């Protein structure tokens, strides 16, 4: 698999490419599948439809890897927090974590309740071409904790940060509990058939450097270290969004570092490029215009050269991006990097 070879810095015939949120609303096929499911959460839980959606970008765009269609919040959902997705607003938990008692009341071994995810993986792997990789994923402990404490997405993360500074032992208990779940959850994804795993730390930038390293990065390192110990042949990709200023403190046992669009690739390459393969980091809105897209691709390839790079966006696909430009991006990267 070209994608897996690239994760381990092996020679590849061209630079592989896939896109975060490549299965999404910009594809009419996705919208049809979602309509059949009835809701976003039901789509995640319906393995047949989730498989369909996972495969769509590979078939339509020609990307080098499929990423499991699911949501990071299925873990807290199965730990006992009722979850709903409100149209035009996003996820909302009906209960939140407020103290040590609420942390202790969370169910353990929630990963055993996620068979619908593992079924999607095994179905997808059976239908996916042998040359194409399947990526599994989860959210980081810190990012999941913010949703569980705030109840929804937040601009200030005030409740989470208040807990971090005034009751750090409560937050640590939650992060520890989540870390244990996520290690087993990703392990079961690997056993079900994924070829790589990725951890999304979407709200990494909410924390100052010292707090980030202690309350997020340390837990990411713990998870990735255990996964590499168990499955050395499976690449681990970490994507902490918005921490470009903290790169000099990044270390740990993982293979690929996801670079967001706000971090110049030349900076990431200088600091991390010898240790980790870099993934990223085209600004997604460049896909609105072909000239802007071409300029962005040219700039990235000039910095990254032939090895140590997986092409991706610096954040997820937007719902109204033209699909023909997404397809063109894949063709362009393949053509320009063919060796």
UniProtKB/Swiss-Prot annotation:
Amino-acid positions noted as binding substrate in the UniProt annotation, renumbered to this chain: 21-25, 71, 147, 202, 315
Signal peptide: none
GO molecular function list: uroporphyrinogen decarboxylase activity
UniProt keyword annotations, A-Z: Cytoplasm, Decarboxylase, Lyase, Porphyrin biosynthesis
Localisation per UniProt entry: Cytoplasm
EC number: 4.1.1.37
Domain of life the protein comes from: Bacteria
GO cellular component, one term: cytosol
Pathway(s) where this gene product acts: Porphyrin-containing compound metabolism; protoporphyrin-IX biosynthesis; coproporphyrinogen-III from 5-aminolevulinate: step 4/4
A GO biological process held by the record: protoporphyrinogen IX biosynthetic process from glutamate
Catalytic activity, as annotated: uroporphyrinogen III + 4 H(+) = coproporphyrinogen III + 4 CO2
Enzyme superclass (EC): lyase
Pfam family, one: URO-D
Marked site: Transition state stabilizer: 71
HAMAP family listed in its UniProt record: URO_D
Function noted in UniProt: Catalyzes the decarboxylation of four acetate groups of uroporphyrinogen-III to yield coproporphyrinogen-III.
Family listed: Belongs to the uroporphyrinogen decarboxylase family.
Name of this protein: Uroporphyrinogen decarboxylase
